[in-house]
Amino acid sequence: MKLSYRPINLPFEYPFTISNGRTKTHQPSLLVALELGPFMGFGEAPAIAYYDVTVESMIADLEKHRRMIEKFALTEPERYWHYLHHLLPNNPFLVCALDMACWDLFGKMKGKPLYALMQTEWNQTPVTDYTIGIDTIDKMVDKMKAKPWPVYKIKLGTENDISIIEALRQHTDAIFRVDANAGWTTKEALDKIPQLANLGVEFIEQPLAKDNWEGMKLLYKESPLPLFADESCVSEQDVKKCVDHFHGINIKLTKCSGITPAIRMIQEARILGLQIMIGSMNESEVGSAAIAHFLPQLDHVDMDGPLLLAQSIATGL
């Protein structure tokens, strides 16, 4: 296989802020391609400062291991993921991009879309939400009114959380989902969640710190709304821990290291009775297209990266 890559840095339509106060105006990412004969597969790895992942560090790893990445004799994507997992053990973002490109390449070689390779049929697919980042209440209302949508994910974790939802609810009957990004204490969550339920919120994503399992166990028993794990469920090893602490999991392809482990996480979550969501890390159309092929297997989806970014780099979604 032949490896190529391209760094990109796409502006957000609006500055994007979450509960820890981080604000982003651009999303840097690395696009990768694997070429074999007349076929080419594409993948994407967003650079996330919170995880100490930069475009520059990913490029350095690609060049360091280029020969090993290219020499693999492709027979099936799962084998390539295991190979990459050992070759790049500390870089799940880059493994994800290469795994994504491999599945895309393999599907083109077989003449099948990814969802068919996963033996699913294209029916009953959920609609993505549209995320509204933390801002002043007036600006959050303006963002929502500028983008009419049936499902909104609203970032919370402020002193004004209830006022934010009350203000937004005055302007729409759309479905609301709340993402606290681990920004609440157990006491705050116990106080806020019943109020949010009365305002028509559908579920809460990651209310507490990722390692606050004791608090989550209490919240799981008391919450009138379903609770979804994000930061608490990064890899395959985390899925089982979420039982009796969360009602569902939000899988991020980038964080779990790709399509291959995400397939296994979904299978395990179904066996354990957990609801399943796949979430975005502000990927462009390239990474979002990979998420889209999982839609028939999901209860919910958050793949709004192309809606949040001000520029498009690909077509097909």
Please identify what each model-predicted range represents.
Residues 10-18, 200:
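Short Pro/Gly-enriched beta-strand edge/turn motifs at strand-loop
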Residues 31-32, 38, 98, 111, ...:
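Conserved, mostly hydrophobic/aromatic
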Residues 211-305:
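Catalytic alpha/beta core domains of metabolic enzymes, predominantly
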